[in-house]
Regions:
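Substrate-binding cleft of secreted/luminal carbohydrate-active enzymes
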Residues: 218, 238-303
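Glycoside hydrolase catalytic-domain groove-lining segments
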Residues: 170, 181, 213-252
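Aromatic- and acid-rich polysaccharide-binding/catalytic face
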Residues: 71, 76, 197-224
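Short, acidic/polar
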Residues: 52-67, 117-132, 193-204, 224-225, ...
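Aromatic-lined carbohydrate-recognition surfaces of secreted/lumenal glycan-active proteins
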Residues: 102-107, 166-196, 239-247
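Active-site groove signature of glycoside hydrolases
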Residues: 126-161, 282-286
């Protein structure tokens, strides 16, 4: 009789202990999941455009800038063949410092070719470079800066040239996917303003992994990038907000299009506001580009 009571007490004890353990485990898992979501939301990535091909000769200069601005992605202009050995060392150094490196390439006229011939030829060079390099020396992806919309042809017939551009980019993206290259595309903030929203959606859905919007609309960035943000979230694409830092007058830039006189801190505040507005996606914060940004930092240090 006593042994039965003892067994019952033990059963109740282990049953209660099991319930407590399960409850504790569920709380722990729930807490971890919550922390994971919170960390995911606040995770910040920052990119830098580099248009000087010779920059690959001085990886320490890139590292210095990257450390100062907490850069996690570097978009380096290259054709995949020039200064290949310097490029390999450059990419390796940045990778060793947890910075992803994308090959930056593109030209206006590439976007006129429906068959994507020129784009494919340049992507092939990047693929060959990667095949001939060690894992640490390989590009993580490509940043395609192809801007056919600035041509007179486009202005005369935007629908036709948008179709050509989309055809070109689809072929490039298919090739990049086949060869394990992440693809980011630079686009202006105004395709929807031109009545080309359907084409914009097709671009985002079918031609890239990442959408890098040249959001040169100081003070109106949140509204200007709204369509792209909605479509990026819809199709699971990463969204970049590129801000301009070149001086007023360069390439016709106005005070309303560049942060040159507003300062880097002001730009950071803009990125923060964008992230708060579009909280369901991580907005990658891109500086355009290294040369004017360095000048601004030097001017700030001199004050």
């Amino acid at each position: 009789m006593k042994s039965d009571k003892k067994r019952n007490r033990l059963s109740i004890y282990f049953y209660g202990y099991s319930l407590v353990s399960i409850f504790t485990f569920m709380l722990t898992v729930s807490g971890c999941a919550g922390k994971g979501k919170e960390q995911e939301k606040i995770y910040q990535e920052t990119g830098m455009f580099e248009w000087a091909e010779e920059a690959v000769r001085e990886p320490e200069e890139a590292l210095h800038l990257a450390e100062e601005l907490e850069i996690t992605r570097w978009y380096q202009e290259t054709d995949g063949t020039t200064e290949a050995e310097s490029t390999r060392e450059f990419v390796k150094v940045l990778h060793n410092n947890n910075i992803e490196v994308y090959a930056l390439l593109g030209a206006v006229e590439w976007g006129y070719e429906e068959n994507g011939a020129t784009l494919l030829a340049h992507l092939e060079k990047i693929v060959q470079y990667n095949m001939q390099s060690s894992e640490k020396e390989r590009f993580d992806g490509v940043m395609l800066d192809i801007e056919p919309y600035i041509s007179d042809y486009w202005k005369e017939n935007p629908e036709e040239y948008m179709d050509r551009y989309i055809s070109c980019m689809k072929k490039g993206y298919k090739f990049a996917q086949k060869n394990h290259l992440r693809t980011a595309i630079c686009i202006p903030r105004h395709y929807d303003d031109q009545g080309l929203t359907a084409g914009l959606e097709e671009l985002i859905k079918e031609t890239c992994d990442e959408v890098a919007v040249m959001n040169y609309s100081c003070g109106n960035e949140i509204e200007a990038i709204k369509t792209e943000a909605v479509l990026s979230e819809k199709y699971g694409k990463e969204l970049h907000c590129i801000l301009e830092f070149q001086e007023i007058g360069k390439h016709g830039l106005t005070e309303k299009e560049t942060y040159r006189n507003k300062g880097i801190d002001n730009a950071k505040e803009t990125w923060e506001e964008l992230q708060k507005e579009y909280e369901n996606i991580n907005v990658i914060r891109d500086y355009h580009w290294s040369s004017p940004v360095r000048e601004m930092l030097e001017e700030k240090d001199a004050d």
